Amino acid sequence: MTPASPTPPAFYYLTNFERALAWLGERYDDLFDAHEHAFVRQFATLPQASRALLVRMLMRNGSDFRASKLVYDEIGCTLDAAAPLVALGWVDPAPALTLDALFALSTKAELLRIFPALAAHAGERKADWLERLRPTHDVAQPLDAWCAQPDDRVLRVTVGALCDRLRLMFFGNLHQDWSEFVLSDLGVFQYESVPIAPSSRAFQQRGDVDAYLALQMCRDALEAWPDDRPFDDLIRALDAVDCAQPWLATRRAKLLFALGQACERRADWYAALDAYTRSAWPGSRHRRIRVLERCGRDDDALALALDARGGFESDEERQRVERMLPRLQRRAG
């Protein structure tokens, strides 16, 4: 392992991001659409400070940033660096902010200046303030419409989805973010150069990337799904995902299993049974047996348990099913 340099070059993160773009261009050029080709081409023509600012924003969470918080010696004036990004449409210099977005970008002291009436509830948390204001502030508007901020602006990155797609192709997943790779010169993360043949690429066609992103959207939606809303729309979205690659089909099966568990927590047995039936994820058959039992379909549960006994998928399934069989046999008569 190469020792980390105590004083990396000022634009080390930009250099590494550009290395990532070059790597993607060499290996995935045939999967890029016109927008992605244009991004890679135009990024290279931007002033260094503008390229660095965009990478800095991509390394951080979210898409909205206070310009006053984007202070980097090597970049200089944030608004000057942002101007070419604004010209390309990659950054919105005056995005409409919901109340939630405004709260996420503001301290309690700043919120008190914007909403003086909150002083009567100074001891409450920001979350409490948000709930107080939400019923009467449901219109999104730019920062200067919320309050006069002559010395500050909000900048919104508008190419986040495109860059997430590039990040997915680079890492092969969405768990890792750009900060991991671009910080490698600090010794925080180390990567070896490994040659990858085209046949060994994680994504063989553009549809594979589309499928991964669609599955990720479904997973994110499941985690945030309202308790009182049926899963019908989510199930339709999952059905629409074309998983041509076996490893993508496995991800879909895992998500269907998670959906089945969510349905069980709601005691929505029929929806749970449907999700488990369509999932090949380990444990799905055992969960189907349990759900059939909860539905009062003892004969069907017993038949599936006996079928499982003809070829267990794992020792864990064998133990679970064999514990269930005596009870199912008694209940089925």
Regions found by a protein language model. Give the residues of each.
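Residue-level detector of alpha-helical recognition elements and their boundaries
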Residues: S68-K69, L304, E316
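Extended, non-transmembrane interaction/recognition domains
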Residues: L255, A271, R297-A303, R318-R320
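Helix-capping and short linker residues that terminate individual alpha-solenoid repeat units
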Residues: S284, E313-S314
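Alpha-helical linker/edge segments of TPR/alpha-solenoid repeat scaffolds
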Residues: R294-L304, M324-G333
